[in-house]
Amino acid sequence: KPFTEYPYLQQVLTELTKMRQLKDLRREVTLEVHIFSFAYKKGIPMDDSGNGGGYVFDCRGLENPGKYERYKTFTGLDEPVVKFLEDEGGIKKYLANVYDIVDPHVKRFVERKFTHLQVSFGCTGGQHRSVYCARHLADHIPDSNP
């Protein structure tokens, strides 16, 4: 022990190294973006981070493939629904607007060394539009925020 002649100083320095604030400085801080798809009738996902924030995007204004029998068994990841949403649903412009909001937020959170951002997409059943949007945002963030 380097400070044996100063036991109190040794104790203080030892306790300082155990402080949470210093542990946070030692580890590399990375931002985790949690992306959810949900059905409004089941409720908006809770933010368990303790920050109580994030974005909730309402996809119900987009054309709903769920109202057509031929799409009911599919999700927003299945090709027939993807084609419908991209060709008739207005989803590309919608997501471009989402990206314009989320991208600067992600950049700023990284700069400020924040560790959590939650983004949720909701629609009527949580199966088609919100699933498509959640998947595309999840694919977009790493590509646009290296």
How would you name each of these model-derived features?
Residues 138-146:
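Post-Walker A helix-loop "phosphate-sensing" segment adjacent to the P-loop in P-loop NTPases
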Residues 115-138:
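Catalytic cysteine-centered active loop of the rhodanese-like fold, especially the PTP/DSP P-loop
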Residues 96, 100-103, 131-135, 139:
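A generic structural signal for well-ordered alpha-helical surface patches
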